[in-house]
Each structure stands twice: as structure tokens, then as C-alpha cells.
């Protein structure tokens, strides 16, 4: 009798695990789909030709005269197979205008107008999505972000470490077959995903990469006739891959950086030191820190997302210990973004295929055992519409509670949580008053 082949058995076990996981994902998706009409006022799912690793709403919207919708713009990339051309893309999305409450939708039982998913008496309006501009890009687009002072100017992170600057108004709607950025920022030796424009100074940019460095760029030093630009400063304060960087939204000299070295570090660009940060937090997460987000309304509050599945909340004035920890994700937390209008609301995405909304004003609230089974008191909402890892998400600046989320399986979703879920009970508690 032949002995068992250990490799064969391992392979069989792995396949069985994959089948089980697939079954669980499908069951979860079926449940989500069944409940979706009660959870959302609007949801669009569209399959892109290629997956995108990046998505961001552009800050404008265009009203369409005599129509019940407006046109919003989305910034996307592509992640194609090795042979196919990649693109930086702009899409138009038609979103229904928020409607005034209709007395015909009055629900006597609940004493409310409308309900979960808005009015049940009106047919949902079809949401139209189409790509309106494709610009040839070298390799996949790891991340794309528009410049706040001029949204036509876009920075992209490339797979070879280059950062490219594009002025979309100088490119035709259809690709030309030639990669022709306005500038190339040369310095990183490996690819990266950390990218943040200064909201304070036009043309200032910070990037972080797998080469363990953080680099500052000043686009105003660009000279015509030479597309290549070198960094104005290079920081070597991290000992491993730099995953995310962000300019502080209220303090022009502060930049936050996070890394696989399990540290959160704060740079003060007024200081000449480039090998050490002005402030740092160590030992507070148990694994790599993937994401950082400064609260745009509470100047001392920031959040970090980690491969240890948790979200850390911090007070800039004391990084020795976290203010609070949020736990509910079942896999690595990969991106974070504060709500643009609700100071206490934070959104997080994870490899567990979920986007979660957290309302920090609920921190410390008592829960019944049944409530506790659904998650911690801060958990406001969980988006379960993706069956694959989420690569990026973005809040819409013109329509509160509208998000766009993109997953690794080509699926792009534009969605708005039902007002009945998030439209009330958001107490105006200053985020600084959070207790650990």
C-alpha cells in the first residue's frame, strides 16, 4: 500500500476550505441582497471592464435642468492583465436629487414619512454610469488623487515607483496609445500606495512607498522642457514599508505616516530632521498599520487602521496611548475616511469585504446582550454588498451619505444608506470628549 502524499492531502484541505469560504460568502451576499431594499435609499452596482485599485469622487456636481438628477464625476484607474493597456479614467454618474418628503408616503404605524429605502410607492430611478475619459497610463494605477486647489490636476502612483502628474484638461476623451503625463516625480525605488496632496499649499504633495521612505514634492519648482522632478525632501524615519501618508487638514506643517513597522509617526516639515519624526506611537497595534485619517473637524483626533483587524483612535497631544479601540472587522483594516460633514462618523474598509460606519458619539453607551451580539455600540452600519476584497472607497462631497466603493473583482458600487438608519440620532458630541 502506498503512503499518503502529504502535499496532495494539504491541497485537498485547501480546496475544501476555499469551497467552504465561497459558500459562506454566497450565503452572506444572499442575505444582504434580500435586506438591501430596507438598508439603502440608493444602490448601483456596475461591473468595470477591469478592476480599479483606486476611486475618488471629484468635488463638483452638475445640475441637469428640468431633470430629477445631477451628474457627479468619479476618478478611477485600471488594474489589467500584464499585456493590456492601463488607463486613468473619469466616469460620469447620474445620481437622483434628494427629494422633499412626500405626504403620500406617510406611514401611520411609525408616524414617519417614507421608510427604509425611501418611498416604496415610487419606482427607483435608474442610476446611469459611463466612462467619459480614458488616459493612457504606464502600468496599473495604484492610487489616484486630485489636487484640491485644481481638480483637473491628478497625481497617480505607478507600479515602478514613479509618481505621475496629469492635467486631464490637456488630454482627449479617448486614449491616444501614448503615455504622456505632464510631470514625472522620480525618487521612489519601489511601488507605493501612500499619496496625499496638501490642502493648504497648491502643488505640494507627499508620498510613501515600499522603499520605506516618505518624500515631499513641490510641483511649483517644475521647469518647462523637463518633465522629471526630484523630491524636495526624503524622510527615512520608518524601518519598513510605508503604507499611508496624510497631510493634516488643519495644520499645514504636519504629516501623518504609518508603516509595516507598526508605528504611527507625525512629521513636522518645519524641522530639518529627516531621519526621525517629531512624534511617534509604538506598540499600540499588534500588526502592520495600513491606514491613517485625521479628523477634518477635530484637529487633535486621528484614526489608524491595522492588519490586527482593529482601528485605533488617537489624540495628537498624547500618542503614548490610544484614546479608544474599535473592533468588529474580522480581517485586516485597509482604509479609513472620516465623514465630510458628520464630525463623529468614521468609515473603514477591510479585507473582510465589509465597509463599516462608526459613530463615535455612541462610545461607552450601554448595550443589551442582544445588541452587543450585533457589534460594539459605535457600529452604525455595515455595507456587505461586496463578495471580494474592497480596494478603495470615497465619500461624495455633494450628497451626504453617498459613497462609492470598488472591489478587486471589477465591481464598483455607488450607494446611499437609508435616512431611516443614519438620518437621526447622530448626537453632536465633540470627538475630543471620547474616553478610552
Swiss-Prot record:
Function: Regulatory subunit of the histone acetylase B (HAT-B) complex. The complex acetylates 'Lys-12' of histone H4 which is required for telomeric silencing.
Keywords carried by this UniProt record: Chromatin regulator, Cytoplasm, Nucleus, Repeat, WD repeat
UniProt protein name: Histone acetyltransferase type B subunit 2
Record region (Disordered): 1-22
Membrane-spanning segments: none
Subunit and partners: Component of the HAT-B complex composed of at least hat1 and hat2. The HAT-B complex binds to histone H4 tail.
Cellular location(s): Cytoplasm; Nucleus
Acidic residues bias spans: 1-19
SMART domains: WD40 (SM00320)
Disulfide bonds: none
A biological process from GO: chromatin organization
This protein's GO CC annotations: cytoplasm; nucleus
Membership in a protein family: Belongs to the WD repeat RBAP46/RBAP48/MSI1 family.
CDD domains reported in the protein's UniProt record: WD40
Region called Interaction with the histone H4 N-terminus, residue ranges: 370-374
InterPro entries cross-referenced by the UniProt entry: G-protein_beta_WD-40_rep, Histone-bd_RBBP4-like_N, WD40/YVTN_repeat-like_dom_sf, WD40_repeat_CS, WD40_repeat_dom_sf, WD40_rpt, WD_repeat_RBAP46/RBAP48/MSI1
Broad class of where this protein is predominantly found: cytoplasm
Ranges: WD repeats: 136-176, 187-227, 237-277, 284-324, 328-368, 385-425
Keyword check for Transmembrane: no
SUPFAM superfamilies, A to Z: WD40 repeat-like
